[in-house]
Amino acid sequence: AHLIYIRYLSGNIMKRLLFILVFIYTTASFSQNALYKSDAFTIMPDKVLQGKFMAEAKSAKEINSNFISSYTKPSATKISFKFSIDGRDNENVTGTDHLYILTPVNGKDTTPVYVFGKPDPVNYSSYPSHFLNENTELLLKLDMRNILSEIKEKGYYKCFDGSRITKKNFKGVYIAGGIPPLSWDFEKLPSLKNSKMEDSDGDGIYEIKLHFNTTYTPSEEFKTLWKLKNNISSYPSYSSPQRLVDALYNMSIEEMIADIREDGAFMAGIKWPGVWTRDVSYSIILSLAIVNPDASKASLMAKVKNGKIIEDTGTGGSWPVSSDRMVWALAAWEIYNVTGDKDWLKKCYCIIKKSSEDDMLTVQDKETGLFKGESSFLDWREQTYPDWMDPKDIHSSKNLGTNAVHYKTYLILAEMAKLLNEPSETYTAAAERIKEGINKYLWMEDKGYYSQFLYGRNFFTVSPKSEALGEALSVIYGVSDKEKSDRVISNTPVTKFGIPCVYPQRPGVPPYHNDAVWPFVEAYWAWAAAQTGNVKSAEKSIASIYRAAALFLTNKENFVSTTGDYLGTEINSDRQLWSVGGNLACVYRVFFGMSFNNDKISFNPLVPEAYAGIR
């Protein structure tokens, strides 16, 4: 039995949603049974168990974890680093790093003298890198005489970014880098014991001794505790018989707050301080339009230039090789459906319409009706594309997820046009042609799911790979009919720790999009599974998200699909925005089954039996 009570604290259902939901799911089973159990891990109402590791929710405001990664990586002889004054990234523009090749003799090595803000004394970029064959003590030297002289003569040193270092605020010189004992976390450099350089004889040449081992664990700062610090009472609250779920919900709300920048927009994560079109859009669609429509609006408007949507970087630079920017339209529509803001509707309609006109001229393939361009969010060519494919090949390919986004975009344009008394038929026809093209050219009958993309040069063929995000979007947005939707959820390959971005994997390619699970993709998969009524699939996806967030004590960007470890992927970040949105979506999109339309809110809850109780 489902019983839902709703109280809106604002007069209009489509204004900012501040509500209390009470959801009762009655069943014979109750709370001390496992929520999910597999050979790899178990989710209990208050804890996660994985081998010798356990994460336990002591309350809805505290989680303890003893997870320590066993992942180690061989150290390379080529190291990259930057110098820092006062623990800020103020030596050079992002991406301009120093290089050195470790060449130890009896375990010791000394660098030539580097100069702050200047090119390397030796151009090491073309030197081959090997694995370090002995633990090494490196004496690294930095010439700061020009900077110190400038501060003495002018009273300040002007950094590349325009900031000034004065004698009064000059606190110290630090080194940042990617291999332990170095760290790229500039803000923490002053507190790290292996980062401050010293000028012991006062000659202006700073030195530091660094110890590099033959193998290393990429991050040695393993968390053991999350405890709620911020007041989150102004956001929708959630409570249930599952203490772990309550704590993860609260942790996600807190991380969402931490991801709000000074300008009111969302950053993509701790390591990604910028506003990214696809990151904020997918996050907004999942749950952030519901939780924080104001920051969602600010984020989307930060990605508009000259009245058009900005495409994120990707293969070939950006648009039109990457062409998934229209996910912005889906997020904008979600905000309108949640808030009912007519001014927002009018503004976004003009932006989406203008952007779509460029896409139809430049990106749409007239023969198939599909839109060309890179896989949505899979924007690192080597990770998911064959070696022979260069940017022009990727531009000419037709991807599942990107086309699902375009399909929904034109449905949205048609709906917006109707609400604004504008012609809508062209948009409806465009959407239908995309849907027809996806089902005609990308459906793999023998596998029971869609192909990642059509690719080729003179002749195009179907890639045998699945693509988790595209499969999920096709189900959620109705590209697939009921029969195909059921088959997609039942047949798309899933690993023991979750659904990988693509399947099969590229051998020899390090995990990132390849051989990796991304919690936000997992959340879309859970949403799609719930929409088809596939309880087992939804249960597994929710468990995948909760396992990682609890053990790692943050909503990580990704983790390795074969090990379940967040170490081992090429890049990873804490409190990744779309992972935060995905965690919250387990509550909003699955347990409550919430969906918003321009005139109503609907509930179609899917609550696995193990999650029974009042929430």
Regions inferred by a protein language model and the residue ranges of each:
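Aromatic-rich carbohydrate-binding modules that target alpha-glucans
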Residues: 32-78, 85-104, 156-214
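Structural helix-adjacent loops and short alpha-helical linkers that scaffold large soluble proteins
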Residues: 235-246, 287-300, 335-353, 367, ...
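Extended glycan-interaction surfaces of carbohydrate-active proteins
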Residues: 21, 235-274, 295-319, 364-398, ...
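Aromatic-rich carbohydrate-recognition surfaces in CAZymes
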Residues: 274-280, 284-375, 379, 399-407, ...
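Non-catalytic C-terminal accessory modules of carbohydrate-active enzymes
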Residues: 495, 524, 528-615
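Bacterial Sec-dependent N-terminal signal peptides
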Residues: 1-34
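Active-site neighborhood of glycoside hydrolase catalytic domains
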Residues: 400-442, 446
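Acidic/polar, glycine-enriched structural segments that form the non-catalytic walls/loops
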Residues: 216-273, 337, 342-344, 349, ...
